[in-house]
């Protein structure tokens, strides 16, 4: 809730920064997905007012984006492509703004709850165990743990790798840092103990949990989506989160801060997989067919999976039980009404195969 309230606070600030009239935001909207989407749309619009057309960049499931300096400097980590881009439109000493943002980004910790992605406050705490440690090597080929090394690398980048481009009325200065080739594996390794714990607790395959995490967030603990799915496994508070709380006999739904904790997120996401596997889709007898259904349901819901086969849920389960697993896979990847869910099954299934081979 803290970060949602921050959006309410900064919306008028962003508008004033860009010279636009303040627009009132109804706090009641934040209680549902539509409200969050409206707030995010406003946030994106206000970033456009500051940075210009075609320069809107906001955090996503596989993109960490943090603004500082009255929204004139930003750090972007693309966890899919493996690139960090630090940019500024500051007109006074842009190199200094870039340098500070580089240092802060390289040394940030892995606690998403401590960083507000929607504020321009530089609330990034220098960590003794940086999240990017081992994922970035400096110009001497060394990993970066200490502030002095990050500062030396920042100086090197600003002096030798500075780029400049013009976009609209702005001159944008930037530097780009490549993550190491196996950055995905390094992030996955961080969470293996948590994955193993959740796997044993709920009876869900480790390989499936890892495949879901890779597909949902590329192991980005700061992951957010336009529909307010949160964290490594992109758990939605009022759907999967609520179901898990009900399973535990708890009222309500998990908080945003709860789901931004990596261990809580993995535990909740895995618990939801177990609910799908054992309850909603537990009548599917073949374990491979059930796994295909569970994967698709994690993305689009159990009801939509069963409706692919029949509008009657009991009959749908019977139809699936009369099919070969390969036919179930073919049906879900070609006849599910949502293209995202069709592609999701393909992606997760392929990722799971790679984790099973390790």
Swiss-Prot record:
A lipid is attached at residue 17 (N-palmitoyl cysteine). A lipid is attached at residue 17 (S-diacylglycerol cysteine). It is a lipid-anchor. Pfam families: Mltc_N, SLT. It is found in: Cell outer membrane. Residues 1-16 form the signal peptide. SUPFAM superfamilies: Lysozyme-like. Its EC number is 4.2.2.n1. It comes from the Bacteria. NCBIfam families: PRK11671.1. This is Membrane-bound lytic murein transglycosylase C. The gene is mltC.
